[in-house]
Amino acid sequence: MYPLLQLALSNIYAKMAHAKLDKPPKKLYVNNSIHSDLLWAVDHLSRLPGTHVLKSVDWDTSDADITAYCDVSLMGLGFWFPDQSVRFWSRIPEDPPKDTIFYFEALSVLSAIIHSTSLCTLVKRLVVYSDNLNTVQIFNSLSALPAYNDILKGSVDHLLSDIDNLIDLWVIHITGKLNIVADALSRQYFNTVVDYAPGIVVNTFSPPHF
């Protein structure tokens, strides 16, 4: 079983959602989006070992090799890694394809996933906190509308990028009141960030573009 690759079915499900149960079934037209999703799955299947890629989820947050906190405002995207005392900030990208804040919340989680492996020698278990419940749900269920599917596919690409070290990801909801540093970071309230996390290193980044 390859549960992480279920994202290849997102556009197929979206097409099937319009089918009428009281009508005879029709052939499914394979458009460019469906074709791209299926090729994405085939590419991973050609490289992955012949065992399931979903490892044990029976682990605690204290077992994580690295932890990130993410947040978004209309001013920017921000995430930070407390144990590494490193923060990342970016301006809001232009022309989001879907609901602005939700899309950028998901994009910030993907960005944290991508940067996590550059800060830790070996990442086997990664925890990411977000105060956006919808974002938490799509990453943990690997189920979203097609507009967000490229973000989820990007996360799976990174989790499976090293077949000898597949990464377990756990995205967890946190209340906004407890996500102070990431919130301040996204709003460019850097003085507040320093008050709560002295000595933290500031980096800018460019979010993935789809």
Please report, for each region that a protein language model flagged, where it lies by residue.
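C-terminal functional segments of enzyme domains
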Residues: 1, 167-210
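C-terminal reverse transcriptase regions that engage the nucleic-acid substrate
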Residues: 1-57
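Conserved, non-catalytic sequence blocks in retroelement Pol enzymes and Pol-derived host proteins
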Residues: 2-4, 25-38, 57-60, 95-101, ...
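Mobile genetic element proteins and their domesticated derivatives, centered on retroelements
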Residues: 12, 69-71, 79, 108, ...
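Two-metal-ion RNase H-like nuclease active-site motif
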Residues: 61-74
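A short, polar/acidic, helix/strand-boundary loop motif
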Residues: 82-107, 111, 115, 133-151
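RNase H catalytic domain
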Residues: 113-180, 187
